């Protein structure tokens, strides 16, 4: 098991924008924030490189709005979408924390606003996955 915090602004990986240059199709990220986020994730995760099936837990800590002041933040239902945050982060982990994101067989992901004074980023925990772990997760989630 390994856990770490990636400080920065988590960036969602959306669709790519395509254009033609010199007769070739070029695909570009729709947001310029994705590349710096993936690089920050790769830098922090460098040297972990796990083999086999993996369970991932991630908590994305997003910026507070000015209107929140020091009040407790409500559950975050605004953009960015949690699946797009996960996609960009998994790409940053590929080749540094694991060989390929196909190794991820289960995950728990949370998106929330930062507490007052808390930095934005992502708490990431990677654990070896087992059949027993998956059975416990399924049993807990679906009360089987």
Go through the PLM ranges and name each one:
Residues 1-144:
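Acidic, proline/glycine-enriched N-terminal capping motif
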